[in-house]
């Protein structure tokens, strides 16, 4: 089998996959994504490309290590997504896009194919890793989805790390917001130039994994749409739209135009 870095290079910058491997208990696999689309090479410097490849390789390796030691698929997808949430490169966690009010609001979800259990969170502003909160909602509450301040209050009871909203802010995302507001349109309508192009193509992160026990898990995390208003919620925290897993079918983590997926 080729190395993680070789594999990521072969299948493209925005998606990386560990090919199924055979072990005594059964095959395992993990797939990750860092947002919809692909970027033309002439629009990305070698330095920026290397940063994305490195982080994607770290993310997929983190998930693969969990599976290789016999761990659960849910822990594998969480491990992979935490790496991407902690990176300023993606529209999830640190480095996520700004709302019209100049804040970062985060969504995440996870679903298990074994029993169709799921957890989701939307509109949180202080939870460092929203995917960890989605998992706690699934595992430690009777609910499927929590939102906003209530979700953050639950996060405190779970001893999850809370941060100031400024932790998520990056200068690149602020410039993108200013550009969008100046043109009085949302990011989906911007022509593919400079930072606007990069942001349109890089975004929501996700992972799907199969563990040695044959269980599938899928998870997704995002900051949503640049310049979003009025509490807009996309597909990422919606079970069956942004995330889905069923051992009898497949695992899905979606990225793209959320309203279409929800419909």
Residue spans of the language-model regions?
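N-terminal secretory signal peptides that target proteins for export/translocation
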Residues: 1-9
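Alpha/propeptide regions of enzymes that mature by internal proteolysis
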Residues: 25-263
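Bacterial N-terminal signal peptides
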Residues: 10-21
């Amino acid at each position: 089998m080729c190395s993680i870095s070789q594999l990521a290079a072969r299948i493209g910058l925005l998606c990386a996959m560990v090919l199924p491997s055979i072990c005594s208990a059964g095959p395992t696999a993990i797939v990750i994504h860092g947002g919809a689309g692909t970027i033309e090479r002439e629009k990305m410097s070698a330095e920026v490309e290397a940063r994305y490849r490195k982080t994607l390789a770290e993310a997929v390796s983190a998930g693969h290590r969990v599976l290789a030691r016999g761990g659960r698929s849910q822990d594998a997808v969480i491990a992979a997504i935490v790496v991407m949430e902690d990176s300023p490169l993606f529209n999830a966690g640190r480095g996520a896009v700004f709302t019209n009010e100049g804040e970062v609001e985060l969504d995440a979800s996870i679903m298990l194919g074994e029993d169709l259990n799921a957890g989701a969170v939307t509109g949180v502003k202080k939870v460092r890793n929203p995917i960890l909160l989605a998992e706690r909602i699934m595992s430690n509450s009777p609910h499927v989805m929590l939102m906003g301040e209530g979700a953050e209050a639950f996060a405190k009871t779970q001893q999850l790390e809370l941060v100031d909203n400024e932790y998520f802010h990056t200068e690149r995302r602020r410039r993108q917001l200013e550009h969008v507001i100046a043109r009085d349109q949302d990011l989906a309508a911007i022509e593919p130039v400079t930072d606007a192009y990069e942001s349109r193509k890089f975004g929501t992160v996700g992972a799907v994994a199969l563990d040695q026990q044959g269980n599938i898990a899928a998870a997704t995390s995002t900051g949503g749409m640049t310049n979003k208003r009025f509490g807009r919620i996309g597909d990422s925290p919606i079970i069956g739209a942004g995330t889905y897993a069923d051992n009898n079918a497949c695992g899905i983590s979606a990225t793209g135009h959320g309203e279409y997926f929800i419909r």
